[in-house]
Amino acid sequence: MSQQENKVFMAMELSKNNWKLCFGDGKRERQRTIPAGQEKLLLDEVAKAKEKFGLDPDTPVFSCYEAGRDGFWVDRMLSRNGIVNVVIDPASIEVPRRARHRKTDRLDASRLLNLLLRAALWGERKVFAVVVVPGEGQEARMRI
């Protein structure tokens, strides 16, 4: 059994109106877009990805997203639903210097998924830096 079996990976590109979800199992990729902040729709898409990849409903999910204006409530929501999440420092993400860099939510989500897979499946250590998620009270004090 390989390391990636029985795991689903999800990268999220969060924007004001929509969230781009990019799922993978180490072999295939599936992208979906949902309205921002819709927890039930997010969980429905996670279930559909597991089904599409032929995995059990209780298959663990590992996810990531870039730290940004949404703060850390998304991380807490994912954790509350049994999803293991890391919040990535956007400044730590490698950017191709030579090639012209196209920026779309679809491409960004796919790149984030690739980084998550490199770290989780192939053990690459310096793929990205993880942000320490503050508690709710600490986050509220930071916003003042």
Question: Which role fits each region the language model picked out?
Answer:
Residues M1-N6, E29-R32, L55:
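Intrinsically disordered, low-complexity and often Lys/Arg-enriched segments
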Residues S2-G24, L112:
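Gly/Thr-rich phosphate-binding beta-strand-loop-beta motif of the actin/hexokinase/Hsp70
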Residues K7-F9, T59-F62:
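Short active-site oxyanion
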Residues L14-L42:
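Short glycine-rich, Thr/Ser-proximal phosphate-binding strand/loop in the N-terminal lobe
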Residues K40-V61:
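Short, basic/hydrophobic alpha-helical segments
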Residues V61-W73:
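Acidic, metal-coordinating catalytic cores used for nucleic-acid/nucleotide bond scission
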Residues G71-D89:
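TOPRIM-like Mg2+-dependent DNA-processing core and adjacent phosphate-binding/basic surface
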Residues V87, A91-I144:
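Long, charge-rich intrinsically disordered scaffolds of nucleic-acid metabolism proteins
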